[in-house]
């Protein structure tokens, strides 16, 4: 009948990952923030697997607190971690932080965490409508 040839080619591939950690606490002070921040950044970095098809990984931390100490929003805003792997050929990683103050209904983020603010706003608006 003849020969059958099969050719497979992968033209394009990209892996994108996000690891989200939720922390619920009564009062978020500087000491608590730093302890969680250090531990979760280390944990998130350990999960990143830079390789040929890796495009990006987001490590996101969301704090849900009854109250937030006045110095913590400044710490959140100043906290940054961005890693490029092999000049971005093996992708990159961003560390995103958001904190929601349940008492004042305020949301604080670092620069990379700005998209989290929109998500938290939409979730809290829906929650307020259902009460």
Question: Which functions belong to the PLM regions below?
Answer:
Residues 31, 69-74, 108-109:
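Switch/connector loops and helix/strand junctions flanking conserved nucleotide-binding motifs
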Residues 78-131:
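Charged, structured surface patches that assemble and position nucleic-acid processing machinery
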């Amino acid at each position: 009948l003849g020969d059958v040839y099969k050719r497979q080619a992968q033209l394009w591939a990209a892996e994108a990952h996000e690891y989200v950690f939720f922390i619920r606490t009564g009062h978020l002070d500087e000491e608590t923030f730093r302890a969680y921040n250090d531990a979760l950044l280390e944990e998130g970095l350990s999960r990143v697997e830079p390789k040929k098809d890796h495009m990006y990984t987001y490590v996101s931390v969301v704090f849900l607190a009854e109250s937030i100490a006045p110095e913590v929003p400044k710490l959140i805003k100043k906290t940054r971690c961005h890693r490029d792997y092999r000049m971005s050929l093996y992708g990159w990683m961003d560390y995103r932080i958001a904190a929601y103050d349940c008492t004042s209904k305020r949301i604080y983020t670092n620069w990379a965490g700005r998209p989290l603010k929109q998500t938290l706003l939409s979730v809290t608006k829906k929650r307020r409508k259902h009460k």
